[in-house]
Amino acid sequence: MVDGDTRPAVARAWIPLQPERAMQTPNDLPQPETVVVTATAVPARDLPVVGAALTIGDLPAHRDWLLEAPRDLELQSFVDAEVLNGDWAPAVAEARRLLDGHQGRLGIHGPFWGFTVTSYDPDVRAVVRKRLSQALDVCAALGADQIVIHSPFSTWGYNHRGLYPADAARMLDAARDTLSAALARAADMGVTFVLENIEDKDPADRAQLADALGWQALGLSVDTGHAHYAHVSTGAPPVDFFIRAAGPRLHHVHLQDADGYADRHWPLGMGTILWASVFAALRPLGPVPRLIIELRDKAGVIASARHLASLGLVR
């Protein structure tokens, strides 16, 4: 939780690496002393507890599971513009009723359809600022303290890095114009925005952008399926390197399985992600980020949690 404006006096300039070195290789990225690819013996009391990404409509079927342990929850009912522009107060009231007794941390997935947080169009940036402000309004009403937003980095942009030298500064200026007001308000509220990898090929890009913006109210999220897609389909490093590259800014992880071809959001164990390596990368980072199972079919959430428990990775 953040109290007030915690920006450093001078934010570090964000400068992408040269094209031939733009993406850090696995050897360049932060490494633990020992890379572990199989589950290690960790006392059960020290294992993390997983939560889930659900809509309000999914809560009744998962309420007992959510309340049996301090499970973190990400509500995904406040993503659409139609919802944010409408009367969402009844939805918040219903969520609060269903979550009575919930002891985990609460966040929301913020709006993302149709825009990026680094648009070069000032009119689009104005719309994005409005959407982020609306998301903060929802957090205030819900008592939530985290908002997931999407990374602006893409494979297209990565492959053209260096061809347009002004792009890095222009992107940073656009991000600052779009996000600064929301981050200032979030800091006052004790809310953290987390920037989720989408098409990111270089795991370090989001951390560099967050460092350049300089707000502690901006953290990072890693989506395991998105990272696996980037690894298999675009040549990015594997999922565990995305975890390590996020470092101390990692506040949130979307746990979903995939085959690396598409954004599957399969139940955990159905795809080809090496879960032992993911959790080995998480272990040295310190405070446990929110571990959020995010599936297309919510009926697989509890079974996915049990799968991780059977591997000795979570409680």
Feature annotation, model-predicted:
Residues 3, 8-136, 140, 314-315:
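N-terminal pre-domain/capping segments
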Residues 14-17, 24-48, 60-68, 117-118, ...:
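Histidine-acidic metal/acid-base catalytic patches
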Residues 47, 70-72, 101-105, 139-146, ...:
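A general structural motif
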Residues 48-54, 73-75, 106-108, 147-149, ...:
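Hydrophobic faces of well-ordered beta-strands that scaffold small-molecule active sites
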Residues 55-57, 76-80, 111-113, 152-154, ...:
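Active-site beta-loop-alpha junctions enriched in small/polar residues
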Residues 89-92, 122-133, 165, 169-176, ...:
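Non-membrane alpha-helical structural segments and their capping/turn regions in soluble enzymes
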Residues 91-102, 178-185, 277-281:
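Catalytic-core regions built around general acid/base machinery
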Residues 118-219:
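Active-site acidic/histidine proton-transfer and metal-coordination neighborhood
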